[in-house]
Amino acid sequence: MDERAVAEWLDGYARAWGSYDPDEIGALFSQDAVYAYNPFDEPVRGREAIVASWLEDRDEPGTYEARYQPVLVAGDQAVAHGYSRYFDTNGTVADEYDNLFVLRFDASGRCASYREWYMQRPGEDDPA
């Protein structure tokens, strides 16, 4: 993998999140992929289980946006950073998260291992 390939994968990840199309989601991951929503929970195992997990708890279209970019690419592994924003019904930012992904890819460019760390940014009313 190189930086461009990882950036394209991340763009596909954001598109799949927006569409919730099972084929788009599945195309991102290897058959035996592991997907950890956070580093401390048991990961979801297998492409079909990952797709089902995504489809279980959908965000409403237009209520969020995301942007991610590679920070480091070394062989079949990558680290990416970005943000996810969620909006109120009036369009203002309700919540914002910084995200860090640790990724490993197979020879076909599909993600074989996904582990995410996320941290909510403090809001204007939150103590810094």
Where are these regions (language model features)?
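Short beta-edge strand/loop motif at the mouth of beta-sheet-based domains
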Residues: 42-52
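A beta-strand edge to alpha-helix "cap/lid" segment located at domain peripheries
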Residues: 2-5, 51-128
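Secondary-structure boundary/capping signal
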Residues: 21, 33, 62-65
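Short beta-strand segments in beta-sandwich/barrel cores
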Residues: 33-35, 85-86
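A short gly/proline-enriched turn/hairpin at secondary-structure junctions
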Residues: 34-44, 57-59, 117
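Structured beta->alpha junctions
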Residues: 14, 39, 70-72
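Short, low-complexity N-terminal intrinsically disordered segments enriched in polar/charged residues
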Residues: 1-31, 125-128
